[in-house]
Amino acid sequence: MDHIRNIAIIAHVDHGKTTLVDCLLKQSGTFRANQAISNEERIMDSMDLEREKGITIRAKNAAFKYKDYHINIVDTPGHADFGGEVERIMNMIDGVLLVVDATDGPQAQTRFVLRKALEAGAKPIVVINKIDRENANPHRVLDEVFDLFVSLHATDEQLDFPTVYTSAKEGYAKIDIKVPSTDMSLLFDAIVKYIPAPRAHAGVEFKMLVANLDYSDYLGRIAFGKIYSGKVKIGDAAACLHGDGRKTEGKITAIFHFEGLKRIEITEAHAGDVVGVAGFEDVFIGETITDNITRQPLPFVPIDPPTIQMQFAVNDGPLAGLDGKLVTARHIWERLTKEIRTNVALRISQTDAPNIFNVCGRGEMQIAILVEQMRREGHEVLVSRPEVIYQKDPEGKLLEPIEKLFLEIPKEAMGVAMENLSGRKADIVHMDHHGNEVTIEALIPMRGLIGFETDLVNMTRGLGVMSHLFHEYGPDRGEIVARKNGSLVSMEDGEAMSYALNMVQERGRLMVEPGEKIYKGMIVGENARENDIPVNPCKAKRLTNMRSQGDGKGIQLDPPLRMSLERALEYIGPDEYVEATPKHLRLRKKILDENQRKRAAQSRAPKAVLA
């Protein structure tokens, strides 16, 4: 047990966390020098989406050997929508590597994960990365990191953190920035020296806290976590102590640990190690696996509650089934059920309508990632606008989720940001100026956060950073105006014609190009005014045997407005859907027929309350 180290790596997007892990795995000999690492860099980001978006979504494990030590690494997601992942990881580790860019310094998302780590009592090592960059300023960054620790109420012991200067790209680490170095051995030594051995007891009964789940078609659910005490062998009788008080008896059918990124099957495991065990089909994150049904469960950090819900519906549009193979309600429900086996922060439920399902999560990004994964797997699905989950207090008053928002923005963007926040009913709690940056802390309703990330990118030209945590359920703060513009809605089925689109674009911005398939009820553009207008984008120019004066003049169409999935989900109104298929993203009305839409609007009931 003294030769095991469990560490997490914390870093802001693009500060080189994943590259650093690649470097550690290569230099520790986990990958042979001539072995191709899946022919691409960034080994830890194994999901396609993670590579594309440059973010870590799922917490993943890796491990390497250094001298006699077995070092387990857990990669932490930095995005606050995946906060559920971060909190669980903290139970497994004893120390953290805080990776900070030598030019940019610590950012808002680093703060979110670091706070959780310090609260859990983890021992930090600060790694100042990318010191090979021309404009690197490691000394200033070190001062900023120290200030960050102080502002997060770190203990005196945590404030006395060791610092290692690295270039993960070039593959070297230094303790003294002036002394040349050729490899990462100083960082390996620091991990072994400063990070304590796991908090665990060797001699007593076997207990393990489940922090992550995986699924295998042969073994069923595999529960990953740290062994807090005792040891376990394949074939041992075991018990699972569930969160709701139930207890299930079973048998350990397989044990895994990590070497590099591979899961290696082993026959027994001891206290302090991070392993996966199979044998319990209905085990869930936060539950305890132990050797006997009479044992007490281990304490568990509760995960932030879901605060947002969306509806997933079967694609019933005229173009359904042209792109995707998996289009029925059964396919969607099976995929959602599979997702919640491993994704703890999601909840799913069926509704009164057989082809509509509710999906609740921590934020729109998290649910958008799920929709994007489903598209790639061949699903077609309709997704509604995110709605917040309300609660009622004992007196029957409405309570809505309030989030704590952390913003880091350039000084010149402060005015527009404050104006935007006040329109979203945010209360500014704290503001801090440092150099050309401003850090803002605010309490904002979850409704106000929907669509804020896109606004932030526009207001700060991509330089703003945000993260948010669940704060409390508070009184309803009144109406927030979401979108001021109405939609241009097609009243015909057919193909978009440039002649017709030329007339439609006088009313607002187009979202389609000539030649695209269109159907009744599909949104083809954004109206310049607040109301919806039915338009006919499929009208062809009548041919006559008389030439008019305008003949031969080319029609000039503005480039259409194209949206990413996240942006589309924020953009649509409450009576609209995003139609996500493997090849297309379309916006449409929930009710396609115009007359039925008008009737529904007249008889629309007041806003439903989620108890």
Regions found by a protein language model. Name each.
Residues 1-611:
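Structural and coupling elements of P-loop NTPases
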